[in-house]
């Protein structure tokens, strides 16, 4: 049974569970779609996460009890593929200077580097939420044998567009940032672009993606094309 929590006088959170789970996250997305379809005046932001949906609102425009009732009704929305979701195919160059932790991950899991790369590229990962940094996608779930703790000493600066894993999750850093996840590779794809006013973040919660291994030469070629504005975000959409 979903649980409704108040966050001060300007937000409500609807909780569906207490763990990372694709089924729970699908219910979150279904509730989001159902609520947004109501077009309630007074809502300023709708924030889906792994297991909950938080709605920020203006109590002078939208009655709290009315919003609470709408949220509980939205919690029962049928599960279906959201019209807002997209599927992506993201190129990544693995290992070497681009993925300095690939060898460590291979050793820790008892696999070869090639086997780790093949396993990552064989997964279809779900975007559970966007957080931490603008455009930063939390992806899951990884198979159990790839669940590794975060680094004991985080890096002060993780290169932008780095693909990393920690625990049951994978992620891509859209910006240079401190970080304690294991770096496996890097993508030439731009994950956040303010020039795209309609959708500055490439990914959205509920999207899915796969990775494709590329060479360092292909990475350089694609990164150059992206920087020159020759490749739009639609280029990375899966067929």
State where each predicted segment sits:
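Glycine-rich active-site loops that engage anionic ligands at enzyme catalytic sites
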Residues: 1-239
């Amino acid at each position: 049974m979903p649980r409704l929590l108040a966050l001060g006088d300007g937000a409500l959170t609807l909780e569906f569970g207490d763990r990372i789970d694709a089924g729970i996250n699908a219910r979150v997305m279904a509730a989001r779609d159902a609520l947004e379809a109501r077009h309630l005046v007074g809502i300023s932001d709708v924030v889906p996460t792994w297991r909950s949906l938080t709605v920020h609102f203006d109590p002078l425009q939208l009655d709290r009890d009315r919003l609470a009732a709408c949220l509980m009704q939205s919690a029962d929305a049928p599960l279906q593929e959201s019209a807002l979701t997209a599927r992506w195919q993201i190129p990544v160059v693995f290992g070497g200077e681009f993925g300095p932790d690939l060898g460590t991950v291979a050793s820790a899991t008892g696999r070869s580097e090639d086997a780790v790369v093949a396993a990552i590229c064989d997964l279809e990962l779900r975007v559970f939420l966007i957080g931490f940094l603008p455009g930063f996608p939390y992806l899951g779930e990884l198979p159990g044998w790839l669940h590794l703790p975060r680094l004991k000493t985080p890096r002060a600066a993780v290169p932008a567009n780095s693909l990393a894993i920690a625990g049951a999750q994978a992620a891509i850093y859209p910006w240079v940032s401190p970080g304690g996840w294991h770096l496996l590779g890097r993508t030439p794809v731009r994950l956040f672009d303010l020039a795209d006013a309609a959708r500055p973040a490439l990914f959205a919660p509920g999207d899915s993606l796969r990775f494709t291994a590329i060479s360092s030469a292909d990475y350089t070629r694609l990164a150059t094309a992206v920087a020159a504005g020759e490749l739009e975000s639609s280029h990375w959409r899966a067929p």
